[in-house]
Regions:
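Phosphate/NTP-binding elements of NTP-utilizing enzymes
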Residues: 1-244
Length: 244
């Protein structure tokens, strides 16, 4: 029987220490020098600690309640009432009772984007990072919506740790073809560019033409198909050729 070897769950910290600091929500996002782990949790609490390529990564603590209506990842249907809204300006024109109805839904989407999301996968509570959630739930790719892949989940967890660790300059990722990396990278570019002000995010490829194709065929469609509450106010065309 196959046993995965991409990661292992380790216990480098006493459970009593984890519980004590969880109670006061003292675990800070980033590298923890005292325990030599990288915390990717943004809730102040941690749960399992993964060892990926000798990189010790502390995940968020598993919540007590996880939706168990499905046994695998499923994309949540975007409410029809919100599909009609194209920009924040349209949203402002709606009555207050409409906004009050949908604000909890929108707040939850922002929370998942920031903290990540737990779901039931073959009977197991499974965590995905906020970036991975944005890719699976809100990114449009050539076949529609991306599939959930365990290898991608680990990739995004490792990538989140690289972003969290002040010692890190990034990651080197050796990939095979047709792994979905171009779409994952495009999704991350859009995700980061739409939550950080006064920042520039570029695309590097083996040629300028290939970089432009990635922008027009992958980055722009993902951006265009974001729901209105994730779209920043922008000037110019919806489908530009060189920059958003």
């Amino acid at each position: 029987m196959y046993e995965q070897t991409l990661y292992s769950v380790i216990s480098p910290i006493k459970q009593s220490t984890i519980s004590r600091l969880n109670k006061s929500k003292k675990w800070s996002y980033g590298y923890n020098k005292e325990h030599d782990i990288v915390v990717i949790s943004k809730t102040g609490q941690i749960g399992e600690i993964y060892n990926i390529q000798n990189f010790k990564i502390a995940l968020p603590k598993q919540p007590k309640k996880i939706n168990k209506t499905t046994d695998k990842w499923t994309v949540e249907e975007y409410p029809k009432e919100l599909k009609q809204i194209k920009s924040v300006f349209d949203w402002r024109d709606y009555p207050d009772n409409f906004k009050e109805k949908w604000e909890p839904y929108i707040d939850e989407q922002f929370k998942r984007r920031e903290e990540g999301h737990w779901f039931n996968n073959r009977g197991m509570a499974t965590y995905i990072t906020g970036t991975h959630y944005m890719y699976l739930q809100w990114s449009k790719i050539d076949v529609g919506k991306p599939d959930f892949r365990e290898a991608n989940r680990l990739f995004f967890i490792f990538w989140e740790a690289c972003k969290a660790d002040v010692r890190s300059y990034g990651m080197c990722y050796l990939k095979n073809r047709r792994s979905g990396f171009s779409f994952m990278a495009s999704g991350e570019v859009v995700n980061l560019a739409t939550i950080n002000s006064d920042s520039r995010y570029g695309i590097l490829s083996k040629s300028g033409a290939d970089a432009k194709t990635m922008f027009t065929d992958k980055v722009v469609p993902i951006s265009v198909n974001y729901p209105f509450f994730f779209k920043p106010i922008q000037d110019g065309m919806d489908r530009p050729k060189t920059e958003l």
